[in-house]
């Protein structure tokens, strides 16, 4: 995203939140302005952080689970072991939201009526991935 788009995003968020901060003073100090300034700084920082997420940082081999899921073809059958030791699968890989770090998988429901269940997994909680041929 370009810097103009990032600035527009910041300005829009601030404009939506501005009615929450009418000018008022308490003890001679404008408390709402101080709070608004802190919120503005937090918005700027968060938007700037989201702008620094690039393809290079998402595909960085030092982040192995992200690296793996960024390269899996949708429709691939896999099993996932989480950092808590839970095994998920076999499941069918659907998609990977690289910005938010969410893995989407589906599996046939074992309850009636028959259907599919979609599971969303935090990529940072994945310990290993097994591929089936």
From Swiss-Prot:
Major localisation: other
Induction: Expression is regulated by the sporulation-specific transcription factors GerE, SpoVIF and GerR.
Keyword entries, A-Z: Glycoprotein, Sporulation
Gene deletion effect: Spores produced by the deletion mutant are more hydrophobic than wild-type spores and lack the polysaccharides layer. Mutant exhibits a crust-like structure, which is loosely attached to the outer coat. Disruption of the gene does not affect the localization of the other crust proteins.
Listed result of changing residue 119 to A: No change in SPS layer formation
Domain comment quoted from the record: The N-terminal half is required for localization to the spore crust, while the C-terminal half is necessary for spore polysaccharides (SPS) addition.
Protein name, as recorded: Spore crust protein CgeA
């Amino acid at each position: 995203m370009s810097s103009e788009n990032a600035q527009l995003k910041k300005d829009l968020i601030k404009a939506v939140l501005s009615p929450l901060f009418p000018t008022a003073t308490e003890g001679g100090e404008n408390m709402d302005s101080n709070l608004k300034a802190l919120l503005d700084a937090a918005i700027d920082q968060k938007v700037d952080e989201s702008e620094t997420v690039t393809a290079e940082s998402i595909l960085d081999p030092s982040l192995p689970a992200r690296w793996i899921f960024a390269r899996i073809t949708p429709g691939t059958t896999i099993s996932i072991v989480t950092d808590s030791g839970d095994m998920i699968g076999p499941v069918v890989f659907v998609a990977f939201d690289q910005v938010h770090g969410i893995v989407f998988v589906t599996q046939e429901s074992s309850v009636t009526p028959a259907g599919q269940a979609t599971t969303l997994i935090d990529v940072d909680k994945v310990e290993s991935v097994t591929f089936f041929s």
